[in-house]
């Protein structure tokens, strides 16, 4: 997910995307704690995607 692509989305789409990413992060944390997570790098990817979405939302709020 690129920030340039996120900037083209509406605020409502970004909020929906953020909600989905937060749910994915929660599920990954649960899988990690139970030992079911094989690809641990996905936690880092989701965390950075969340940061990208929040950054774009803040940019749109300030504009």
UniProtKB/Swiss-Prot annotation:
GO terms for cellular component: cytosolic large ribosomal subunit. GO terms for molecular function: structural constituent of ribosome. CDD domains: Ribosomal_L29_HIP. Keywords: Ribonucleoprotein, Ribosomal protein. GO terms for biological process: translation. Pfam families: Ribosomal_L29. Belongs to the universal ribosomal protein uL29 family. PANTHER family: 60S RIBOSOMAL PROTEIN L35/50S RIBOSOMAL PROTEIN L29, LARGE RIBOSOMAL SUBUNIT PROTEIN UL29C. This is Large ribosomal subunit protein uL29. It comes from Tolumonas auensis (strain DSM 9187 / NBRC 110442 / TA 4). The lineage of its organism: Bacteria, Pseudomonadati, Pseudomonadota, Gammaproteobacteria, Aeromonadales.
């Amino acid at each position: 997910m690129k920030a340039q692509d996120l900037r083209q989305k509406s605020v409502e789409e970004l909020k929906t995307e953020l909600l989905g990413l937060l749910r994915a992060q929660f599920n990954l944390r649960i899988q990690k704690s139970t030992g079911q997570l094989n690809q641990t790098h996905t936690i880092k990817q989701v965390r950075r995607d969340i940061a990208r979405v929040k950054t774009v939302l803040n940019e749109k709020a300030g504009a």
